[in-house]
Amino acid sequence: MGDSNSSQEAYSDTTSTNASRIADQNQLNLNVDLEKNQTVRKSGSLEALQNAKIHVPKHSDGSPLDYPKLNTYTFVPTTVPPYVLEAQFDKLRLQDKGTVDGNVTDDKNLPKEFKWGQFASTIGCHSAYTRDQNYNPSHKSYDGYSLSSSTSSKNAALREILGDMCSEWGGEERLEGVLHSEIGANLEFNTTEERKEWLQYIEKVKDFYYGDNKKNPESPESVHNKVYKSDWVNELNKEREKWRRLKQRKLQQWRPPLTSLLLDNQYLILGLRIFTGILSCISLALAIKIFQNSRSNNTISESKIGQQPSTIMAICVNAVAIAYIIYIAHDEFAGKPVGLRNPLSKLKLILLDLLFIIFSSANLALAFNTRFDKEWVCTSIRRSNGSTYGYPKIPRICRKQEALSAFLFVALFMWVITFSISIVRVVEKVSSITNRN
């Protein structure tokens, strides 16, 4: 009992001593302020206050209260430990991010007089903190990583997907391309191992672009997984390059047969000539039929209709073209190959195709002009008095004229294709002979 009484007396003496020191410090500050005011009144300006020497008395015991500019708040113990403030700060930061850590201390554990708003502004710069406590060391490694490798890999992936933000996103095409794997539709797998690797690659692409990633990007597990993201993206790019090379290899396998078909196959050029001859025969028949209908008296106009240039030119050009097609088809299929004959004579013969291309183009232009001629039977214009300008409209002749224009257009296209392939064949043979010599 004696010891307890003595400790209580010592505690009361210490408390009274501290209270007296605080009162003395307040009185000291008041005296200093009064002396400053008197100095300003005597001099009449604030500049004299800077040069004036203010006498500040000191306590004799050398306590912190001897220094008037020392903040006494530093020596008052805080009621909330610093680690509680750090935990509450982490909880507030995670709430802003959309996630809450279960290990964060709840508000119920705090004292009633604790107000979060008063301490939130002092976290990290409180006078009771040391220099090493101004940041949370538990997140040091995560923050350092997020500013270096994870951010760079994430930005690289976003730049690859969203290269141009001004262009269209094309999400439907991307989804169709991944889910239906159009690249794999044209691939032929030699072994089951290649098919298995292709399916694994497709699954990785689906998981990368369309996976259900609902984890918190700021959580420790998510940050730890980001370490492998860069390597995983590199592996995915390697597999993508592998399948791109496989597709290129498949295309290279089809290229030699296609080249041989265009340059060496005699049946290809023969088929093109026959098809062009059929179109020329049909065009010639339509032109002759239009010519006959125009010369005969009809019940609508009760007179003969004047002939148009397209009809006469179609008859002349197609009649000569049929004879030329028969001759050159026989020469190319049954004659000597280009390598065993004079290339110049063969080239002169093929250049006649260019002559028919020119006349067919002119004939096509005249056919369209005849179809929309206001003074012919396909377009009739009525005057205000009810009479027609030019010939009345005759549907049966107009239908034949439209068909003639269509067949002339297709025939012109076939002339151009046949001429191009023939020229390429002659040039390729001549260049190969020159290289051998």
UniProtKB/Swiss-Prot annotation:
UniProt induction comment: During S phase of cell cycle.
Sites bearing Phosphoserine, chain numbering: 45, 167
Transmembrane spans: 268-288, 309-329, 349-369, 404-424
Glycosylation site residues: 297, 385
Cytoplasmic topological segments: 1-267, 330-348, 425-437
Subcellular location: Membrane
Extracellular topological domain residue ranges: 289-308, 370-403
Keywords: Glycoprotein, Lipid degradation, Lipid metabolism, Membrane, Phosphoprotein, Transmembrane, Transmembrane helix
GO cellular component terms listed in the entry, alphabetical order: cell periphery; fungal-type vacuole; membrane
InterPro entries: Srf1 (IPR037737)
GO BP annotations, alphabetical order: lipid catabolic process
Region (Disordered), start-end ranges: 1-24
Principal cellular location given in the protein's record: membrane
Membrane-related topology note: Multi-pass membrane protein
Purpose of the protein: Regulator of phospholipase D (SPO14) which is required for SPO14 catalytic activity in mitotic cells. Essential to buffer the toxic effects of C16:0 platelet activating factor.
Quaternary structure annotation from Swiss-Prot or TrEMBL: Interacts with SPO14.
PANTHER family for this protein: REGULATOR OF PHOSPHOLIPASE D SRF1
Name by which UniProt lists this protein: Regulator of phospholipase D SRF1
The encoding gene: SRF1
